[in-house]
Amino acid sequence: MTIMSSLAGAGRGVVNTIGGAAQGINSVKSSADRNAALVSNTGSTDSIDATRSSISKGDAKSAELDGTANEENGLLRESSMLAGFEDKKEALSNQIVASKIRNSVVQF
């Protein structure tokens, strides 16, 4: 091996090292540029921020209406139950009256 080939081998090693470092720097820069482009191209969140409060208000109103509906359903069930009791009382009263009429007819 001659001095020239040793120098050439050393030169190639230096060039390869410098080239590898340059590629690494370029990869890091490309990645940073890509991330910056992604962030800058996503647009603003103004429209999301604008709708967030109305969605929150809508959710609150919906919860309020659900509570009112539950109360009304409870009152409706209670009214239906009371009406059923009244019907049963009326039917029982009718049976008592009919029984008294039958008993009075039999006695005459």
UniProtKB/Swiss-Prot annotation:
Protein name as annotated: Hrp pili protein HrpA
UniProt feature, compositional bias: Polar residues: 41-56
Keyword list, A-Z: Fimbrium, Secreted, Virulence
Disordered, as annotated region: 41-73
UniProt similarity note: Belongs to the HrpA type 1 family.
Primary localization: secreted
Entry's localization field: Secreted; Fimbrium
Domain of life: Bacteria
Cellular component terms (Gene Ontology): extracellular region; pilus
Function, in words: Major structural protein of the hrp pilus, which is a component of the type III secretion system (T3SS, Hrp secretion system) required for effector protein delivery, parasitism, and pathogenicity. The hrp pilus functions as a conduit for protein delivery into the host cell. Also, affects the expression of T3SS-associated genes. Required for full expression of genes that encode regulatory, secretion, and effector proteins of the T3SS. HrpA-mediated gene regulation apparently is through effect on the mRNA level of HrpR and HrpS.
